[in-house]
Curated annotation (Swiss-Prot):
Its EC number is 2.5.1.157. It comes from Methanosarcina mazei (strain ATCC BAA-159 / DSM 3647 / Goe1 / Go1 / JCM 11833 / OCM 88). It is found in: Cytoplasm. Its main location: cytoplasm. This is 16S rRNA aminocarboxypropyltransferase. InterPro entries: RNaseL-inhib-like_metal-bd_dom, Tsr3-like, Tsr3_C. It catalyses: an N(1)-methylpseudouridine in rRNA + S-adenosyl-L-methionine = N(1)-methyl-N(3)-[(3S)-3-amino-3-carboxypropyl]pseudouridine in rRNA + S-methyl-5'-thioadenosine + H(+). It comes from the Archaea.
């Protein structure tokens, strides 16, 4: 697989406005024009990849991210409310494999990634490593996430499909 891809993948955030604006990674990404914020589900692009922790299929390099990647930046209660609306959008639901958070709030906790970390992980796995590094470069703790997860991210990025991702993940859990 290529070390990096030439064009950046569009990144989208459904932002419910429920977080501390000073700590919100989604808002910061939007300020740096790394992602677009949406406050309505109906405005999200169709056919994109939705990073969904409850998805049956793991994100893998076999997925086509050209239509973009979507992250939900909201509470779990809000997720339950919006999921019926999300079903109408024809999105590709994908779960991220095992990784540790590098952010100060959840440092070292498995699966507790914030929006920026979720995007960086997805981009890295899909082969867009430079874009992943660009996202993380905007946060003073961003290097921690990439360093903590360098080995699994490299392995995940070599997988052929979702099944291989799950196999690789089993070595880290």
């Amino acid at each position: 697989m290529n070390q990096t891809k030439s064009r950046d993948i569009p990144l989208y955030i459904y932002h419910a406005g429920q977080c501390d604006p000073k700590k919100c990674t989604g808002r910061k990404m939007a300020r740096f024009e790394l992602a677009r914020l949406y406050d309505r589900i109906s405005r999200l692009p169709r056919s994109a990849i939705l990073l969904d922790p409850m998805a049956e299929k793991a994100l893998s390099p076999a997925d086509d991210p050209k239509k973009g990647i979507i992250v939900l930046d909201c509470s779990w209660e809000e997720v339950e409310r919006v999921f019926p609306e999300l079903e109408k959008l024809n999105l590709e639901h994908r779960a991220l494999p095992y990784m540790l958070a590098g952010n100060p709030v959840n440092f070292g906790r498995p699966f507790k990634l914030n929006s920026a970390e979720a995007f960086a992980a997805a981009l890295y796995i899909l082969g867009y490593k430079e874009q992943a590094e660009k996202v993380m470069s905007k946060f003073n703790w961003g290097h921690s996430f990439l360093e903590l997860n360098r080995e699994p991210l490299e392995e995940y990025s070599t997988a052929k499909n979702s099944t291989e991702i799950v196999e690789i993940q089993s070595h880290y859990i």
